[in-house]
Design a protein with these regions (language model features):
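Charge-rich, low-complexity N-terminal segments
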Residues: 2-132
Length: 132
């Protein structure tokens, strides 16, 4: 195998992600009144921000992880230790709506954004890969 062939195999499209945690409270206003999620409760949300693209031959990475963090910090400040229902656009803060909201906030800053994963418990979550 030639050196050029090895480089072509190594420098392909890849997806990377950075993991964040937020603590937040919410209630779901559109479920029946007797549903447990209609009551005020909180979660330790686990949020993954994924970006995908070609691996840069010089740096060896898709994107600097620090750039992902820098883009997410202002979003995290709006969510962490807040009542999500009070955040404009999150009046019905399901995991699905939260993932889409985060996408809309980050996509101008992260053009290679490929997926948002929101996990509200250790067994429940969703992933959003952007508008069709």
């Amino acid at each position: 195998m030639t050196h050029e062939t090895r480089l072509a195999q190594v420098y392909k499209r890849m997806e990377i992600f950075r993991l964040f945690h937020i603590e937040a409270a919410h209630r779901l206003p559109n479920v029946p009144a007797d549903h447990k999620c209609a009551r005020l409760h909180g979660h330790s949300f686990r949020i993954e921000i994924h970006v995908a693209g070609e691996v840069n031959r010089d740096s060896g990475w898709v994107q600097d992880f620090a750039e992902i963090k820098a883009a997410f910090v202002p979003v995290k400040e709006r969510l962490d230790h807040h009542y999500l229902n009070d955040v404009p656009g999150l009046e019905n803060p399901t995991s699905e709506n939260l993932a889409e909201w985060i996408w809309n906030e980050l996509s101008p800053e992260l053009p290679m954004l490929s997926k948002i994963v929101v996990q509200e418990t250790c067994t429940c979550g969703c992933s959003y890969e952007g508008p069709e």
